[in-house]
Amino acid sequence: MEIPNPPTSKCITYWKRKVKSEYMRLRQLKRLQANMGAKALYVANFAKVQEKTQILNEEWKKLRVQPVQSMKPVCGHPFLKKCTIESIFPGFASQHMLMRSLNTVALVPIMYSWSPLQQNFMVEDETVLCNIPYMGDEVKEEDETFIEELINNYDGKVHGEEEMIPGSVLISDAVFLELVDALNQYSDEEEEGHNDTSDGKQDDSKEDLPVTRKRKRHAIEGNKKSSKKQFPNDMIFSAIASMFPENGVPDDMKERYRELTEMSDPNALPPQCTPNIDGPNAKSVQREQSLHSFHTLFCRRCFKYDCFLHPFHATPNVYKRKNKEIKIEPEPCGTDCFLLLEGAKEYAMLHNPRSKCSGRRRRRHHIVSASCSNASASAVAETKEGDSDRDTGNDWASSSSEANSRCQTPTKQKASPAPPQLCVVEAPSEPVEWTGAEESLFRVFHGTYFNNFCSIARLLGTKTCKQVFQFAVKESLILKLPTDELMNPSQKKKRKHRLWAAHCRKIQLKKDNSSTQVYNYQPCDHPDRPCDSTCPCIMTQNFCEKFCQCNPDCQNRFPGCRCKTQCNTKQCPCYLAVRECDPDLCLTCGASEHWDCKVVSCKNCSIQRGLKKHLLLAPSDVAGWGTFIKESVQKNEFISEYCGELISQDEADRRGKVYDKYMSSFLFNLNNDFVVDATRKGNKIRFANHSVNPNCYAKVVMVNGDHRIGIFAKRAIQAGEELFLDYRYSQADALKYVGIERETDVL
């Protein structure tokens, strides 16, 4: 009689039952382990408390209780009551005192906890309701209806109730591994059952085979199975995905299992991971691999690593900066300088911007190479220098550090063959050992400094510039030049400032006439075509900023201002466009100067410099807490920035319903995409109350590509005054929220 085979792997229903049973078993096991751990901790802590209590009791027994000296009875007063103070200790005598009542102390206004911030902090949307809001001890019918509507806004997802909803459980990594391994055992047993059945049939049909051979074959197969762990069947991941759809598709789960099992090895490095350059296992790798983590985590808009304000980092800036910062010095830096080698100084001077001469004169060039002999080192070649050489011949030698700091990938380079009739020579190289870390650092520095070997040697610190020069020749990097299209862009024609101002006014008027909607700025990335109707900046009616990858001559790119005054009138293009002066664009108004002091000629750069006033927090005369200013300010002067969490409009709608129920909201619209919420995180300006006659006003300003909310003085404010804003309530909300001020106005 044949034993019935278990369900095959094709039966998805069988695997679903197994997934459910194993998951329930693992959950029960986790709960049991958690309970046992909690009990063990409770017993251990209770024993420590008992031990400490016993020690304190022994110490207190050694102390003698001394009674307090009794006070003399006070003479009677006709308006004060007399009270008697008795003690439970026998050593203390009763005392008779006159009872004096204290004056009423005003209660401190209610304040909910919040975290201080000095700049906006972007957070993700909360798709699960973290807790049911508390609406008071008395539950009303309208409160129950509100809670039901609130849960529906989160699609019925409440923290702690995920297990009640089928398929909404997010499995942790540890439980996921245990679940797959447990299901994999059923798969192994199933295959073993099939193999045993087939082997039994084959053994019955082949009785002539000796028993020893069959045992040997089974032993070999068993050793192979035990030595190599089989990867789980695809049906297992499909069953888990069908039971828990919130965890992803089967392919995602398979990749997740593979990553978790590979990470179990403590000595194994993550994929595409380069060893620490300062460690003993440093390797010699290319520049792209060395800078991969820096380019991935670095934000080129705020110049920070792992930025919390820009989730989508700007693409690399491939355009070169005009001003040169790094130049090759024509004189040797020391006795071991590479410029002392024969022909090296002429080569360095060839690419030095200071050695340029005007006119069409002929010049002798000496290029160092390994293909020519020492005798030919003094050979010269005459090359004709044209007008194009005057413009682009030496730009690449003095590269800018900023051009590479904003570049996500290293500057593209191409191997430039040696010009004809140029003879080069290489000095006899000394055997110098280079470690993997030094070679990797050289490749990183060479992408920025190119053939400035003196600067590279100073940065390395372990090699002379002569040794660096010889290694560069060996690496064949000495003739690698940046691509012409990146390092030699077309010359930009000069335009008069009045044309740029007219251009800015035209776009601003277009924005004012079309709509009042403000959209979040995202840099455009289409370097091969101009900005047209498909450009995201044009579509959102934003200017192209310095972070965009369009052509520098783009008509939509904001040019900055050329003001000589304070930039606080509409004559300034930046002020007209409701944006602060950019220190990289506005070079004459003072926005790019005096960063170490608060006194600056430009008055349109206060938010980015953080030139806020000193604010005080105290109980308000209107409602709750209020914000007071410590120093006097003039009209239209910057007071503070309204900071908080940067959330989406959908998240603001969900939070706003709860805030409206509490009759306290700190939401502030930033643009059509984001809202600033200062409820959980913010600064002291969040306590500024509403008034129909405010002394401050808020304005959304574009600051270096980011919309930020600035609070400015609407009139001259004296020190110690409370700050008020116009929340722009509707007529019904104004009667509900500002009753104190309304009664004051009537009186």
UniProtKB/Swiss-Prot annotation:
Mind listing the UniProt keywords for this protein, alphabetically?
Chromatin regulator, Isopeptide bond, Methyltransferase, Nucleus, Repressor, S-adenosyl-L-methionine, Transcription, Transcription regulation, Transferase, Ubl conjugation
Subcellular compartments: Nucleus
Question: EC no.?
Answer: 2.1.1.356
Covalent cross-link Glycyl lysine isopeptide (Lys-Gly) (interchain with G-Cter in SUMO2), where: 327
Concerning its family, UniProt says: Belongs to the class V-like SAM-binding methyltransferase superfamily. Histone-lysine methyltransferase family. EZ subfamily.
Q: What is the recorded name of this protein?
A: Histone-lysine N-methyltransferase EZH1
GO BP terms, alphabetized: heterochromatin formation; methylation
Give a short account of what the protein does: Polycomb group (PcG) protein. Catalytic subunit of the PRC2/EED-EZH1 complex, which methylates 'Lys-27' of histone H3, leading to transcriptional repression of the affected target gene. Able to mono-, di- and trimethylate 'Lys-27' of histone H3 to form H3K27me1, H3K27me2 and H3K27me3, respectively. Required for embryonic stem cell derivation and self-renewal, suggesting that it is involved in safeguarding embryonic stem cell identity.
What gene makes this protein?
EZH1
Q: Where is this region: Disordered?
A: 188-231, 378-421
**Compositionally biased residues, Polar residues:** 395-414
Q: Which reaction does it catalyse?
A: L-lysyl(27)-[histone H3] + 3 S-adenosyl-L-methionine = N(6),N(6),N(6)-trimethyl-L-lysyl(27)-[histone H3] + 3 S-adenosyl-L-homocysteine + 3 H(+)
Where can the motif Nuclear localization signal be found?
491-496
Q: Where is the SET domain?
A: 613-728
GO CC entries: ESC/E(Z) complex
An annotated Gene Ontology molecular function: chromatin binding
Biased composition, class Basic and acidic residues, residue ranges: 194-211, 382-393
What is the first-listed, main subcellular location in coarse terms? nucleus
Instruction: Please verify whether the record's keywords include Transcription regulation.
Output: yes
Give the species: Pongo abelii (Sumatran orangutan)
Query: Which superkingdom does the taxonomy of this entry point to?
Result: Eukaryota
